[in-house]
């Protein structure tokens, strides 16, 4: 199974939107936060994760970010 960049982009947009809505982050702050996350790196490395729904992927990101204070990234 190869990386489906269309699905990766879909999940990337969903994760950014979730951060913007839930934590009131700007796009400029949410994008680098998502791009540097382990969730995004795993999404690129493990194609089976790309087939999961965006809700599941967003929950993975949220669990990862609970270890740090996301609001301090504003």
Task: List the model feature ranges, each with a label.
Residues 1-74:
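C-terminal alpha-helical interaction appendages
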